Amino acid sequence: MGGRVDHEYSYLFKMVLIGDSGVGKSNILSRFTRNHFSLDSKSTIGVEFATKSLQMEGKTIKAQIWDTAGQERYRAITSAYYRGAVGALLVYDITKRQSFDNVHRWLRELRDHADSSIVIMMVGNKSDLIHLRAVSEDEGKALAEKEGLFFLETSAMEAVNVEEAFQTIITEVYGIVNRKALAAKEAAAASAPLPSQGKTISIDSAAGNTKRACCSA
């Protein structure tokens, strides 16, 4: 999950936005990466992506976020779209019940095509349209808990919880990467062969010892 690529950043995390057309995926993306919102945002044609770099524990994390329209005619790009993704925002519109009902289908598609360890944040977007709400926050929380997903309601228009949604995924993925790196290091240390003629030397061995142990990096 993620990897070092060049000196400009320590890790590159690919993330995908999924959900029905019209739920506000493109505005969530533009709000996070450019702090921009457009009321006239049109449905995305094909695929586009944007990037944003964040600092975490002294390391630069570059998030590469892919966005595609939710219409059925773009199903052909599914495999390439999900390949290599370490995080996903599954977005529905709190004012459109159908978009919430379709979360199950999107989740199934995501799990069919993405890595099993992908971190998923379910997002109920357009929380500013409270007077038009068709899906309660409790319903969203309950479904997310049942499926083992993170959950937030957002407003791309009012910039509410958009940063938090991405930050949660990035923090979780970063933690997974670190745990895997530590596990790999411990496994390598455990399987390292012992020196053929060496002996165990404690750290408080006499300074006068002339025989030294050879250590592997």
Swiss-Prot record:
SMART domains: RAB, RAN, RAS, RHO. GO terms for molecular function: GTP binding; GTPase activity. The keyword Nucleotide-binding applies. A lipid is attached at C214, C215 (S-geranylgeranyl cysteine). The keyword Cytoplasm does not apply. One of its GO terms (cellular component) is endosome. It comes from the Eukaryota. CDD domains: Rab11_like. It is found in: Cell membrane. It is a lipid-anchor. Keywords: Cell membrane, GTP-binding, Lipoprotein, Membrane, Nucleotide-binding, Prenylation. GTP binds at residues 19-26, 67-71, 125-128. NCBIfam families: small_GTP. Belongs to the small GTPase superfamily. Rab family. This is Ras-related protein RGP2.
